[in-house]
Design a protein with these regions (language model features):
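Adenosine ribonucleotide-centric catalytic and binding domains
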Residues: 55-110
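A general structural motif
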Residues: 59-60, 160-162, 190
Length: 241
C-alpha cells in the first residue's frame, strides 16, 4: 500500500473524529515511539494503525475484535489474529479459526496466517489495545488506546452500510453488545452481532451459558448470509494464500 492510500484510509476514521480522540491517538503514537528506546514493543511503529489503514470506514462489512497484539517476535502486524506471511508457526487461536473456516466453507486450510486479504475486502481486524510489550500480554491495556478503539467500534455501529460483528469470547461480546446498545444500533439499522466463545484452545470447543462454542459456529457463512440479505456483497473468506 502506498503512503497516500494509507493516509487516505486512516483519514476516513480519524478525519472527522472528535479532537480528544485525535489528540490521544497522536500522543500515544509519540509515547510508543519514545518507549521503544527502552523496551521491545509490538507491532512495528508503522503497523500500529494497520486495521484502519487496510479497511477504510466506508468499506467495512465485518468487524473481528481482538484484545491486544501477539506479544512474541515476528507475529503482531496490526491486524487482529493475523501474522505475517513469513511466520510459519501459526498461533493456536488462528489455527482454530482456520479449522472452522475449513469446516464452514469446505476450503483447504490456508498456507499463510496473513489475513490482509480479508482486511482489504472490508473485514476490520481490530484489537481493542493496539500495542503490547514483548512477552507481556495486556501490558498496554491501560495506556489509553480505548479512546481510539471505542470510537472506531462506535463508528462501525453508526455506518450506513450493513455491518456484522464477529464477537469471539465474552470480552468481545460485551464490548459489541454494549456499543450497539449505546448507539441505538441493531438489526433495524443493519448491525448484527454473531457471538461465540473465543477460538483459543482453552475455549474453542466449550460452550457456556451465554455463548455457543466457536468450533461449529460457522461464523463465515453466517456473516455472508446477513450481508447478502441486506444488499451487501459477501466476503471471499477463502482468498488467503
Amino acid at each position: 500500500m502506498d503512503a497516500a492510500t494509507r493516509d487516505r484510509n486512516i483519514a476516513t476514521w480519524l478525519g472527522d473524529a472528535p479532537q480528544p480522540v485525535r489528540d490521544t491517538t497522536n500522543r500515544l503514537l509519540e509515547r510508543i515511539a519514545f518507549l521503544r528506546a527502552e523496551q521491545t514493543i509490538y507491532p512495528a511503529q508503522d503497523d500500529i494503525l494497520n486495521a484502519l489503514a487496510y479497511t477504510p470506514a466506508d468499506q467495512v462489512k465485518v468487524v473481528i475484535l481482538g484484545q491486544d497484539p501477539y506479544h512474541g517476535p515476528n507475529q503482531a502486524m496490526g491486524l487482529s489474529f493475523s501474522v505475517p506471511a513469513t511466520q510459519t508457526k501459526l498461533p493456536p487461536s488462528l489455527r482454530n479459526i482456520y479449522k472452522e473456516l475449513k469446516a464452514d466453507l469446505g476450503c483447504p486450510i490456508p498456507a499463510t496466517g496473513d489475513l490482509t486479504p480479508w482486511a482489504q475486502q472490508g473485514v476490520l481486524l481490530l484489537n481493542t489495545t493496539l500495542t503490547v510489550r514483548e512477552h507481556a500480554a495486556n501490558s498496554h491495556a491501560k495506556l489509553g488506546w480505548s479512546t481510539l478503539t471505542d470510537y472506531v467500534i462506535e463508528r462501525c455501529c453508526q455506518l450506513p452500510q450493513p455491518v456484522v460483528f464477529l464477537a469471539w469470547g465474552r470480552f468481545a461480546q460485551q464490548m459489541v453488545e454494549g456499543k450497539l446498545a449505546a448507539t441505538g444500533a441493531g438489526k433495524a439499522t443493519g448491525k448484527f452481532c454473531l457471538a461465540s466463545t473465543h477460538p483459543s484452545p482453552l475455549s474453542a470447543n466449550r460452550a457456556t451459558a451465554e455463548l455457543p462454542a466457536f468450533m461449529g459456529s460457522r461464523p463465515f457463512s453466517a456473516a455472508n448470509r446477513l450481508l447478502e440479505q441486506h444488499g451487501s456483497t459477501p466476503v471471499n473468506w477463502i482468498c488467503l494464500g
